[in-house]
Amino acid sequence: MSRAGNGGRQRIKTAKGRSASSIKWIQRQLNDPYVRKAQAEGYRSRAAYKLIELDERFHFLRGAKRVIDLGIAPGGWTQVVRRVCPQAAIVGIDLLPTDPIDGAIILQMDFMSDEAPAQLAEALGGPADIVLSDMAANTVGHQQTDHLRTMALVEAGCLFASEVLRPGGTYVAKVLAGGADHGLVAELKRLFTTVKHAKPPASRKDSSEWYVIAQGFKGRPEAAGADGE
């Protein structure tokens, strides 16, 4: 329990078998206001508030009819979409098993597989209005390696979005700062009319993550090229 004089922060007793890093993580979770808020409001993760804050600033969710959530587990972002767009068709995809969410279709598969774009479009009933991605690669503890691995995922997500979005659609994705993000932004500007970025208040201050909000999808380049053949 917390004691007077520590600013309301909780401390946990050390236990055999716990590493210093795991104790630090548990301590941070116990004292994180977003974790407590998520538990109180029924969200599966604190990441839900990142999407809420991004949408409050950029207004991309309201009116969406078809939404894809890449890397849905544990499901916090899809929960937000359900509350903001209760009539929307939502399909989430992840390699990890994810507990069901009312009103959402969840596919346990690799979004980079050849079958994924067609399978998700079929489940949605048409092209997507929005593709969301809060994915990050498993970290190895080396900052540049972690950055490059996550950027490869984001770029794959961008390619996927270009295959399933309707013209005028939106792609929102997590990015880790580190150098390779410049090439991604250039590609997004080629595919979308507006590309903005932000770090929502719910992102931890010591995190290198930020989010890209690409709106106004111009349409598939190959489709435009086919007309001229």
Swiss-Prot record:
Keywords: Cytoplasm, Methyltransferase, rRNA processing, S-adenosyl-L-methionine, Transferase. The active site is at K174. Disulfide bonds: none annotated. Its EC number is 2.1.1.166. Signal peptide: none annotated. Belongs to the class I-like SAM-binding methyltransferase superfamily. RNA methyltransferase RlmE family. The keyword Endoplasmic reticulum does not apply. Residues 1-20 are annotated as: Disordered. S-adenosyl-L-methionine binds at G75, W77, D94, D110, D134. It is an enzyme of class 2 (transferase). Coiled coil: none annotated. It catalyses: uridine(2552) in 23S rRNA + S-adenosyl-L-methionine = 2'-O-methyluridine(2552) in 23S rRNA + S-adenosyl-L-homocysteine + H(+). InterPro entries: RNA_methyltr_RlmE (IPR050082), RNA_MeTrfase_FtsJ_dom (IPR002877), rRNA-MeTfrase_E (IPR015507), SAM-dependent_MTases_sf (IPR029063). This is Ribosomal RNA large subunit methyltransferase E. GO terms for cellular component: cytoplasm. Specifically methylates the uridine in position 2552 of 23S rRNA at the 2'-O position of the ribose in the fully assembled 50S ribosomal subunit. One of its GO terms (molecular function) is rRNA (uridine-2'-O-)-methyltransferase activity. It is found in: Cytoplasm. It comes from the Bacteria. Pfam families: FtsJ (PF01728).
